Amino acid sequence: LLGKKCHALRIASYQAQTEGWLAEHMLIVGIESPEGDVHYLACAFPSQCGKTNLAMLIPPESHKGWKVWTLGDDIAWMHLDDEGQLRAINPEAGLFGVVPGTNRNTNPNACDAISNKTIFTNVAVTANNDPWWEDKETGEPVTDWQGKPCDLAKGPAAHPNSRFTVSAKNNPSYSNLAEAPEGVPISALVFGGRRRELAPLVYQAKNWAHGVLVGASVASETTAAATGQVGIVRRDPMAMKPFCGYNFADYWNHWLSFEERSSKLPKIFHVNWFRRDADDRFLWPGFGENLRVLRWIIDRCEGLVDADELPIGHLPKAGTIDVSGLDVSPETLEQLLAVDPEQWREEMKDIGEYLQSYGERLPERLRAEHEKIVQALS
C-alpha cells in the first residue's frame, strides 16, 4: 500500500499544490445513457465505503441501455484545461481492492477481473491452493491468512484487509478513454462516508466553497480496513487523511483557489449508501442500484430537476430519484433523505471544533461557509 500511495498521492498532492492541479484519493467512472451521452464522475470515499464496487458498477436489470465505464478505482490526478474544464486521469495501471465480500452479487466485474493473472495477499487457501476469502461463493479454506490450519469458528480465515492486485485491463468495464493523456471531463465530484444515521442518501453542495467544506468534513464509521477498530466515527477530509502530503488547511485553501481560476467547475455532492433503520437494517439496497442516485446527480448537473434547499444543501425533491421496481417505500425514501436539525447542529459543532484545530491557517472562506450553515440550522 505504501509504495503506490507515496508518489501517486503523498508526493503528488504537494506537487499538485505547487503546480496548480489536484492529486486525489478518488475513483473515476463514466456513466453512459442509452442515448450515448457520457458523464464522468470523480468520487472520494474513505476506506471500506464501496469505491471499487462503485467504480465497477453494473447497471441493474431496470436500467437496460445504461453503461458504466471504469477509468480508475482509487486515484485521480485532475487539472484545468485551457477552457477551464476540470479533467482527470488515473495514474495507476491496475486495481488494488479489498477482497473479502467480493462475489458475483456484490461486484461481478471484479470477479471476472480477478479470475486470472491476479496477485492475492493475506487471503486463506483451499486444498487446491486456490485463494479463499469471506463471502467467496466457492471452495473451502484449509489454511488461514497466517498459514495456520483454518478454523472458521475462531475468526475470519482471510485478513479483513486482504487484497487483490490485477491489471485494470482485466476489468470488463475498462474504459477506452482510461489512458487518454488529456483526461476526461469531470461533471461532478462526489464525497461520501459510512454513516448509520445523520447523512442523507444524497445532497448537493450550494456552491464550490460549500462543496470544499462538505469534502473537508467527510466522516465515516471506521472499519477493519482502516484501523482494526470498528464503528468509531472519524474525520477523513476528502478521504485524504492517510495520504495528504502537506497541512490540510493549506490543502483546503488550494481547493478553494480553483474557484478563482474557472467558472466551469464540477458540481459537488455527498452520498451515504449506509443509512440504517431502527432495526439496524440498511435502508438502501446499494450496489448496482446506486446508479439511480448517480442519475439524479447527472440530472442536477444538466439542470433537468429541481431540488429542495435545506441548510446542509440541495436535496432531491419527491419523485426525482427513480425507485421504480425497488423494495423502497415512500416512507423509506423519506427516511433516507431525512435531515434531523438537532443531529446536524451537533454535527456542525463537531465539524467546527475539528476545523478550529487547524488554527490561523484555516481558510476564512471555509470558516464563513461553516458559520452560514450553523446560523441556518439555528
Where are these regions (language model features)?
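Charged, amphipathic alpha-helical linker segments immediately N-terminal to NTP-binding catalytic cores
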Residues: 1-25
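Pre-Walker A adenine-sensing motif
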Residues: 25-33
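Short acidic-glycine loop/turn motifs at beta-strand connectors
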Residues: 32-36, 79-85
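Glycine-rich phosphate-binding P-loop
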Residues: 38-62
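Hydrophobic/aromatic beta-strand patches that form the interior of the parallel beta-sheet core
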Residues: 41, 69-71, 87-89, 187-190, ...
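Short beta-strand-centered segment that lines the nucleotide-binding/catalytic pocket of NTP-utilizing
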Residues: 64-80
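A short alpha/beta connector and helix-capping loop motif
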Residues: 83-95
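Conserved NTP phosphate-binding and transfer environment spanning the P-loop NTPase/kinase superfamily
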Residues: 98-378
